[in-house]
Amino acid sequence: MSNEGKCPVMHGGATSATQADNHWWPKALNLDILHQHDSKTNPMAPGFNYREALKGLDVEALKQDLKALMTDSQAWWPADWGHYGGLMIRMAWHSAGTYRIADGRGGGGHGAQRFAPLNSWPDNGNLDKARRLLWPIKQKYGNKVSWADLMILAGNMAYESMGLKTFGFAFGREDIWHPEKDTYWGAEKEWLAPSGGANSRYSGVRDLQNPLAAVMMGLIYVNPEGVDGNPDPLKTAQDMRVTFARMAMNDEETVALTAGGHTVGKAHGNGNAANLGPEPEAAPLEEQGFGWMNHQSRGIGRNTVTSGIEGAWTTHPTRWDNGYFHLLFSYDWALTKSPAGAWQWEPVNIREEDKPVDVEDPNIRSNPMMTDADMALKMDPDYRRIAERFFHDPDYFADTFARAWFKLTHRDMGPKSRYFGPDVPAEDLIWQDPVPKGNSQYDPEAVKARIAGTGLGAAELVATAWDSARTYRNSDKRGGANGARIRLLPQKDWVANEPARLARVLELLTPIASDMGVSIADTLVLGGNLGVELAAKAAGFNIKVPFIPGRGDASQAQTDIDSFEVLEPLADGFRNWQKQDFVVTPEEMLLDRAQLMGLSAPEMTVLIGGMRAMAVNHGGTTHGVLTDNPGSLSNDFFVNLTDMSYRWKPVANNLYEICDRASGQKKWTATRVDLVFGSNSVLRAYAEYYAQDDNKETFVKDFVTAWCKVMNADRFDA
């Protein structure tokens, strides 16, 4: 009989691994992505403002502490050649490098590398040691610097300590306090699963699933040993081109980042990978958050195993120079295997003086190595052309890399108005989506009065303002109404924006903006606010929608068309529209859009109800307009959705009829997006709340609050 006592408190399954509801009902809508990062998980005091805390940070002292850290080798994890620069750069790189442009998720903007799954990805091996080395500095400066900022700054200071003039640095990344639930990393069930297997991210002829950028589960970029671990630099080059493009990088930036990242530091594979313990999330308690511990052999210094590849890329791995290209182009390279059994390339007949010295003993020299990705820069014709230019023009290489590194580490921070600190570059860069400062000294009511005289209906005004604002992504802080880019390419031609209607509205509102010295961006939002006020009045409520002036108008020259193409809505459940049928259900696409817009489940619910009541569907369809008084900001959508005198029946793909139970007569039509608010138990609870007789005014007020949140989501300048 076991001496182990039975659980005296809640059953173990409630506090550890358990069968979640979506295990029993895998097709059920998972609202968890809207219920994360709230005050209950955040230990900071209510009202804590990171930007205000940053004002008390001694930036120069912090930078000097980081520089000192680089050469303060610790016995528990010795620095290669007495310098932690390579390790810190890899930590920063892998923090920022998870960003993908398709949905703006990933990246280093929230310090997510501290949590699962990223903290335990194979590609992040031993970065737990880098963060632990930073802990005394984080402890010292406390709330004045976030982990997210500190990890990226550590990479910057590592480069500066080794001789690179960096392009700049901006503070402003706020930490999260638990793993992100909204980021899709792939469907594979095993680390580093090769393509073509079950749940593969590839289909067809190596067609990588959107929105993914990395080639394997658990990798940041490409496989350094080759496609699926099979060396072939030309095939690897194609993977690199896709992966880096999905991170918003062109060929020149790809070559610069690869070469600049490998100019310093080394890879580690001098040992037996089988001796490594489990990753941090699976490690025993006594490891205290450390993973990949080697208790079978020495496992540190020259005997460290991380990727399995072994060696430095350059002769002098602790200084910034052009040595990477010197070795790449001066020697022929032969395929071999590391002591840990990983594929790598080593030079043929290399001169002794070109070999890097051992990390512990300067009297020992070893061959440098190149990964399959490095060899791709030599063998792919387009990459080689760029690499040769860098080889012959070191200053151009250094500047190009510094700019690409800045882009890599700041791409997910959004507009420049979010940047903070003394090292923010003065230069505006097109990938920052610059917006000129707008006028805020005017009477919004006078502008609304002019708009009211145009004859535009409330639905047209609301739809146009919504379309302008809905592109905002809280993931990378891109998009939104500021800039009025809805009037520019590519947005003005998007099917989602109903180009003909949009052109008509802009034709009437643009002269008003010009006459009154107001931005078109502000004018569009004011028009939407006016439409909401008119709809509320029709429902019997006199309200004034709050407004914050000062938006600017971006120019076409300030707008990277290709970069903005990824913001095109393929579906918008709030306007009951999708461009085509997708494998993903319409309600899942609604949930994804709501999460990207930074909405909670109640906010998503009240917005759907209000948009349906005001009849602002795309193309003027009446699906889901469950009211006899369209255009009125009433709670009729919820009242009729929850009314048991009606029954619902499917009549076509994504189309349902609402019929009177007694007569069988059709009353309305609706889509899956509409019906999910009566079907999903959580959303139905919200729908019933807003359908209550005593919540008619609450519904209007909550709609206005959520509407303003959408209109102002990108106002980091306000």
Swiss-Prot record:
Catalysed reactions, semicolon-separated: H2O2 + AH2 = A + 2 H2O; 2 H2O2 = O2 + 2 H2O
Gene3D superfamilies: 1.10.520.10, Peroxidase, domain 2 (1.10.420.10)
Covalent cross-link Tryptophyl-tyrosyl-methioninium (Tyr-Met) (with W-93), where: Y221-M247
HAMAP family attached to this UniProt entry: Catal_peroxid
Active site: H94 (proton acceptor)
PTM characteristics: Formation of the three residue Trp-Tyr-Met cross-link is important for the catalase, but not the peroxidase activity of the enzyme.
E.C. numbers: 1.11.1.21
Subunit note: Homodimer or homotetramer.
Primary role: Bifunctional enzyme with both catalase and broad-spectrum peroxidase activity.
Highest taxon above the source species: Bacteria
GO BP, sorted A to Z: cellular response to hydrogen peroxide; hydrogen peroxide catabolic process
Gene name of this polypeptide: katG1
Binding site for heme b: H262
Family according to the record: Belongs to the peroxidase family. Peroxidase/catalase subfamily.
UniProtKB keywords: Heme, Hydrogen peroxide, Iron, Metal-binding, Oxidoreductase, Peroxidase
Pfam families: peroxidase
Residues the UniProt record annotates as site (Transition state stabilizer): R90
The name this protein goes by in its record: Catalase-peroxidase 1
Cofactor note: Binds 1 heme b (iron(II)-protoporphyrin IX) group per dimer.
PANTHER family attached to this UniProt entry: CATALASE-PEROXIDASE, HYDROPEROXIDASE I, BIFUNCTIONAL CATALASE-PEROXIDASE
GO molecular function terms listed in the Swiss-Prot or TrEMBL record: catalase activity; heme binding; metal ion binding
GO cellular component: cytosol
Cross-link (Tryptophyl-tyrosyl-methioninium (Trp-Tyr) (with M-247)) at residue(s): W93-Y221
Cofactor(s) of this protein: heme b
Species of origin: Shewanella amazonensis (strain ATCC BAA-1098 / SB2B)
Broad EC category: oxidoreductase
